[in-house]
């Protein structure tokens, strides 16, 4: 069995800015700190939580109609993806790292749902990131709130 990989994308706001939730990978600060000591079951639980939140946010705005085209696009753009996770997680990686270089989302096997079809990909990507961070922070505050507030230090 392949070891569970870190979701880190190299821009950790928990260590650099003191955020309770990383703006990059969406892990909680204590998960970032303790990641290397977690067993594969614990790591998978973290990834599963993040995957569900990503699918919830992206699935309300975008539809993947061709997973093979999405894979080809990811490979062409050299964007890594974890085949054990939902294609919506792959799409999230693509948008996070490459949205400014995408002219036609349909070439990647993806289309915006009707209510978002008139929104630029940059604006949509920013909305997705903002909503995802808010959802992750709400989950953190609900279950792991730090003394004294909103989870930010």
Model-identified regions with their sequence ranges:
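N-terminal cysteine/histidine-rich coordination modules
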Residues: 1-63
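Exposed alpha-helical structural elements
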Residues: 7, 42-45, 69, 90, ...
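Alpha-helical protein-protein interaction elements
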Residues: 26-27, 82, 132-135
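Short flanking/linker segments adjacent to small metal-binding domains or redox-active Cys/His motifs
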Residues: 59-116
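C-terminal, charged low-complexity interaction regions
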Residues: 101-153
């Amino acid at each position: 069995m392949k070891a569970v990989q870190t979701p880190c994308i190299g821009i950790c706001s928990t260590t650099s800015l003191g955020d309770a939730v990383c703006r990059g990978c969406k892990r909680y600060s204590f998960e970032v700190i303790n990641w290397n000591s977690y067993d594969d079951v614990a790591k998978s639980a973290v990834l599963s939580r993040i995957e569900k939140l990503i699918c919830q946010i992206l699935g309300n705005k975008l539809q993947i109609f061709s997973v093979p085209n999405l894979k080809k696009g990811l490979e062409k753009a050299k964007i890594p993806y974890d085949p054990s996770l939902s294609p919506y997680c792959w799409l999230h990686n693509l948008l996070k790292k490459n949205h400014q270089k995408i002219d036609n989302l349909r070439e990647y096997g993806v289309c915006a749902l009707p209510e978002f079809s008139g929104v630029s990909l940059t604006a949509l990507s920013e909305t997705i990131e903002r909503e995802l961070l808010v959802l992750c922070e709400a989950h953190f505050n609900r279950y792991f709130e730090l003394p004294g507030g909103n989870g930010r230090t």
